[in-house]
């Protein structure tokens, strides 16, 4: 599996995004196993245990901007029960959150505020873009709307829809958990390579293309 390695560049200008460099590499743990099989396997076990704890205790920092936020909050109700995934503890401060959900239309005036809140989050941190407006500006192709939050934030998961159903948000959360389970992060903030290795996850759109092409009977939304 291929990984995207991201390193922070302290000498990069402040107006550069992302503030760092990216490159595609192979799994770093495989290289470690080839060098020292004992330490490599030990690091693999420790990394798996840490990732398991991280992905099952994600605390969200919600930033609702429009109608998609209503669908997101519905996922916290009893019929959907987001507590099954360990993500029911909404944080009021970004310093206590693990991931941020951008739900709704992002206006240009709000972009600096969102970016500042993201920078206040502690590592490791992730971003979910929820809804067509957050993903690409949606139907608001106008001067005052940012055409996608990935213009100024590193987005990990995109949840399509206008607005997405709560089930779609939960699926996006599960995809984020799957991605976190395969990440390669330094186990210490002092020792080792400080780069972050993120697995290249396949697109759900491409994975289900053949299945969608074979559909011949289109049911109404009330029957789904």
Curated annotation (Swiss-Prot):
Protein function: NDH-1 shuttles electrons from NADH, via FMN and iron-sulfur (Fe-S) centers, to quinones in the respiratory chain. The immediate electron acceptor for the enzyme in this species is believed to be ubiquinone. Couples the redox reaction to proton translocation (for every two electrons transferred, four hydrogen ions are translocated across the cytoplasmic membrane), and thus conserves the redox energy in a proton gradient.
Keywords attached to this entry: 4Fe-4S, Cell inner membrane, Cell membrane, Iron, Iron-sulfur, Membrane, Metal-binding, NAD, Quinone, Translocase, Transport, Ubiquinone
Localization in the cell: Cell inner membrane
Positions of region (Disordered): 1-20, 201-224
Record's cofactor remark: Binds 1 [4Fe-4S] cluster.
Membrane topology: Peripheral membrane protein
A GO molecular function held by the record: NADH:ubiquinone reductase (non-electrogenic) activity
Keyword Protease: no
Keyword Ion transport: no
Listed cofactors: [4Fe-4S] cluster
High-level lineage: Bacteria, Pseudomonadati, Pseudomonadota, Gammaproteobacteria, Pseudomonadales
Subunit annotation: NDH-1 is composed of 13 different subunits. Subunits NuoB, CD, E, F, and G constitute the peripheral sector of the complex.
Residue numbers binding [4Fe-4S] cluster: 67-68, 133, 162
Protein's recorded name: NADH-quinone oxidoreductase subunit B
Composition-biased stretches (Polar residues): 213-224
């Amino acid at each position: 599996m291929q990984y995207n390695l991201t390193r922070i560049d302290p000498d990069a200008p402040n107006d550069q995004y992302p503030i760092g460099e990216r490159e595609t590499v192979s799994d770093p743990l495989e290289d470690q196993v080839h060098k020292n099989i004992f330490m490599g396997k030990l690091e693999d076990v420790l990394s798996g245990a840490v990732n398991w704890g991280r992905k099952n205790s994600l605390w969200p920092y919600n930033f609702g901007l429009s109608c998609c936020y209503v669908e997101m909050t519905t996922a916290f109700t009893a019929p959907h029960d987001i507590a099954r995934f360990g993500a029911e503890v909404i944080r009021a401060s970004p310093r206590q959150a693990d991931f941020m959900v951008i739900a709704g239309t992002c206006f240009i005036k709000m972009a600096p505020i969102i970016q500042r809140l993201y920078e206040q989050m502690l590592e490791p941190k992730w971003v979910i873009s929820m809804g067509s407006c957050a993903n690409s500006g949606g139907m608001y192709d106008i001067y005052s709307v940012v055409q996608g939050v990935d213009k100024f934030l590193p987005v990990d998961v995109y949840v399509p829809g206008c607005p997405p159903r709560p089930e779609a948000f939960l699926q996006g959360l599960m995809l984020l958990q799957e991605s976190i389970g395969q990440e390669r992060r330094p186990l210490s903030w002092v020792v080792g390579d400080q780069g972050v290795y993120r697995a290249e996850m396949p697109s759900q759109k491409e994975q289900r293309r053949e299945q969608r092409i074979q559909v011949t009977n289109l049911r109404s939304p009330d029957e789904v």
